[in-house]
Amino acid sequence: MDWDAKMPSWDLGTVVGPSGGGGGGGGGGGALDLKLGAPTSWKTTTTVSAASAAPAAVAPPPPPPASSSSSAAAAGKRARAGQGQQAAVPACSVEGCAADLSKCVRDYHRRHKVCEAHSKTAVVTVAGQQQRFCQQCSRFHLLGEFDEEKRSCRKRLDGHNKRRRKPQPDPLNPGNLFANHHGAARFTSYPQIFSTAASMSPQETKWPANVVKTEAADVFQEPYYHALHLNGAGAAAAASIFHHGGNKARKHHFPFLTADHGGGAAAASPLFGCQPFTITPSSESRSSSSSRHSNGKMFAHDGGLDNCALSLLSDNPTPTAQITIPQPLFAGGGQYGGGGGGDVSLTGLSYVRMAGKDTSILAKSATTTATTATTPTTTSAQLQYHGYYHHHVSADQGSSDAAIQALPFSSW
């Protein structure tokens, strides 16, 4: 069948319906506006609704001025500070004390919360207990913990004394002076004592004329022998050296020079520096033996020196005999005894003045200690020493041999 290619004409008026006034195009547009709305109407409606809702919103208050806010903050701070000061007003801790410590001149009482009167009161009541204020630690303490004399607590006082007081040195004890020296009894050399005498000139070391009498100017011109260290075997060797020789060939051993106090000689041992002492021979053995003392050391030689073995005892018929000492051990501090068989004592040096003659004398010098002893002899003589031991000298007027007795001396 044949199709009609022409499109039928549509009548809009019949489809939509008649509209009063205007053409068909205008009527069709009005019908669409009622159902869908035009774009212009949408914009107008939105603008009108926004304008009507704006007055309904609540507007925020305007910001206050800066000056008013700072003044309010300062006022709040002042109020809080005033409350704190009222709560921290210092008051005395003692019960019943209404003292206002804010008026005290010293800040000490405000810091420790005690008035000046109660800080020195013997007994106060704090927290229901009897206490006392300690001025050392600035606290209240019970009466049992307090020292009434010192006005301080005992615990604080003990610590204060320990910090302030220096330790006192132990009293001088001769046993502790030579703690480094052990073993058998010995003599010890002290160069710090004798160095002064060794360096002194002959003019400075002259003894008074009434104390020392020099019989020969060249009595100390010969070479000196070394000193003996009296310790162990050295003591036995010393016993064999120090004896009285002569034509009679008699030997007097010194028991204080031997370790076992025996009479026999022992094997020889080296010679060392020793504590100074002097042995003076008798008048009988002048030509065979002599001993010397110089600068705090002992020197001895035995036999064969007849031309130099000068007597150290005076042959003067006066009632005193004196020992010649070339140099003193110390520059001063001497004590000199009177005449007539008295004693002569010097600091660090001891020797004898004896009545009569032809008497064996033993003199010794030693380091000064705190004690001094004097021993009378049969010839009304005295041996005064400053040291650790002494020797008793006894002799008969008719005999030239003198027995020498040794007393025990301290060993360290």
Curated annotation (Swiss-Prot):
What UniProt keywords apply to this chain's record, in alphabetical order?
Answer: DNA-binding, Metal-binding, Nucleus, Transcription, Transcription regulation, Zinc, Zinc-finger
Listed GO cellular component terms?
nucleus
Q: Which superkingdom? A: Eukaryota
Induction per UniProt is: Negatively regulated by microRNAs miR156b and miR156h.
Does Ligase count among this protein's keywords? no
Q: Does the keyword DNA-binding apply?
A: yes
Compartments, as annotated in UniProt: Nucleus
Q: Where are the zinc fingers (SBP-type)?
A: 89-167
Query: Where is the sequence biased in composition, kind Gly residues?
Result: 18-31
What name does the UniProt record give this protein? Answer: Squamosa promoter-binding-like protein 2
Q: Which organism is it from?
A: Oryza sativa subsp. japonica
